Amino acid sequence: EKAARRLGDLGHSNLAILDGGAPAWQAAGFTLYQGVNVPSKVFGELVEQQFETPSLAAEDLKAMQEQGESVVVLDGRSPKEFRKMAIPGGRFCPNAELGYRLPMLVPDENTPVVINCAGRTRSLIGAQTLLSLGFRNKILALRNGTQGWRLAGFELVHGATPTVLPEPDEAQLAASRMQANALLVKTQLQTVDGETLQTWLSDDRRTTYLCDVRTAEEYERGHFTEALHAPGGQLVQATDEWVAVRNARIVLTDDTQLRAATTAMWLRAMGHQVWVLDEDASQAPKTSANAASDSSTLLPALEPHKLSIR
């Protein structure tokens, strides 16, 4: 009722309140979804069904490692999650970075690559991203991620420090741009120029999100003033944490367009309207004007005892 009143104050008129709320919905035989980032997690399952993304069990990976087989294990999660728990021998490489940095992380095309997360979604999305980009290595998702590893009776590494990601040289950057262009053409993803983007951002009738999908370090070195920092892998995994307005425009930016394109590919498949900015974010000036990724600079602090009396 409070939300309905607030929406009415904002000028909305076609409003209704669900009689009985969620309990009544469930009592009527409809489904209630539980958990976090549910749309993204459901999407991961659909991707596996659609593409038949290959995977392997924890026992199989463990056997490969014990037999001394050459295999690269890449953890597609955030730095914080990697520190909390990781597969022994695994290397930190967030999902959006996989296609961008894989040539620097594997010795040759004959080396199998296993992508893991804590459960399923990012393992599947990360592996399928590499497959969709056409890498010739054997690409596999680790079934059930670190959870599956632990349930199989194997120990995890806790407190691991994420390895610094390798930086591409000029030749690798050029190759990345070519790969991005090929993906844009193949998937018919839309691009947008800076002038049009500014028009969209000034439009008070429709929300536009500009998301910088690079690493935090790159973002801090320089970014477009209006850009939110939203690492591409996490933006796909937890879209609802960045995009609050339905049918909003989503514009993604990076340096070579590869990370933006792979992220856009999945966001569009999820039903979002998404564009890739055709400008190089690495050439943007360092600015303190945009602190959108740090809400503490935008909102006043509120002590717990003050919150409790409101």
What residue ranges belong to the model's regions?
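Rhodanese-like catalytic fold shared by cysteine-dependent sulfurtransferases
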Residues: 1-72, 76-209, 213-310
